[in-house]
Each structure stands twice: as structure tokens, then as C-alpha cells.
Amino acid sequence: TLDIIFTAEDEVLNGFAVPANYTIIWVDQNDAALWTGDEKWLRTVLAHELQHLVYFNTVKGPWWLPEPMNSLVHGTPTWIVEGIAEYFTEEWRPFRYELSHRYHVLRNTVHKIQDPHNDGYSKSLYLADRFGDSTISKILNHRNKLKFLDFKESFKKHTGITLKQFNEDWRRQMNTFYFSQ
């Protein structure tokens, strides 16, 4: 079962999900509604947080490893966690991603992007475009002999390149795109 908790407490910006199969979502309208465009803010946040729950259930370690350790051993970068939630539930929007992303690319500071949603979404789009949508699923569902997801190993197996090389290829692609405009 998945538990969804709606709250009016102002301690939560939008919402968050945890590996224990629950999500907490703030129902009061906030500044984040400005970047959702025509999409209803609550629908956007709910879809995003539910995607996190799908992710957590996909990457869990073997049944014999107790919580929370079975959720912490895979080494998945935060940009994947947030990026695929954005990729599967949202659209690239000017106020949500484009302006910040363009700013960092043009100033050669993509390595300083603080929010893993921004570069994560961009990297997820690039990953899917270059290797296909199904590669994301293959990477996250791959298990080694011990029945663990080793993200770096799985990434290389299903893309043919290392994460480091992927990040460099992505950076070059972003430079080519933004500097050619």
C-alpha cells in the first residue's frame, strides 16, 4: 500500500516521498504554483511524489536486507532520483527549468546547479534521447549477483559508457545547444 498524507502545515515546500511507501504533500497554494503553467499545482506535485514511490520500490535491495539499508545501497545519484520524477511527470518549462539551466550552461557553472531537479531533468531527457526510454528502466531494474542494484555498474552495462563520460557528454551537448542559439 501507498500512503498519501495531505497537510496544510507550512513546513513542507511542495511535498516529499520516503522509501517507507508514503508521501506528504502540502495542499496550500504556494510560490511553486507559478512555474506549473497551465497544469494544476497539486496534480503536478502528487504525480511527482508518486513517481518517487515507484522509484523507491524499483531500486530496493534484496528482501533479506532490512529497511532502510535495502534502500541505501544502490548509489543512485540524486539527479537520477529527481530527474526521472520530472521526466515521467512534467514538461520542460521556462520558469521551472529553462532559465536557470540556460544561466548555468552559458556561465559554465552546470557543476554548481544546486537543485537536482534542474540538471536531473535535463540529464534524464538527454539519457532517454540518446539511449531510449527503456534504458532508464533497464538501469534501475538491473541487479548484480548479490541481487543489489549497483547504479554505476548498471549504467555502464546498459549505456556502454561510464557515468563520468555521460556527464561530460551531457555538458558538451548542453554547450552545443545553448551556444548555437
Positions of predicted regions on the chain:
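Post-HExxH zinc-binding segment in Zn-dependent metallohydrolases
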Residues: 58, 66-110, 157-170
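Beta/coil-rich, acidic/histidine-enriched accessory regions frequently appended to metallopeptidases
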Residues: 141-181
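Sec/Tat-exported extracytoplasmic proteins
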Residues: 1, 46-50, 54-62, 84, ...
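Soluble non-cytosolic domains of exported or imported proteins
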Residues: 36-45, 75-79, 114-118, 130, ...
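Long, well-structured alpha-helical subdomains associated
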Residues: 94-143
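Juxtacatalytic substrate-recognition/specificity segment
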Residues: 1-69, 150
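Second-shell loop/turn segments in exported
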Residues: 29-41, 69-75, 108-114, 126, ...
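Secretory-pathway/luminal and periplasmic proteins that interact with or process carbohydrate-rich
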Residues: 11-16, 93-97, 145-152
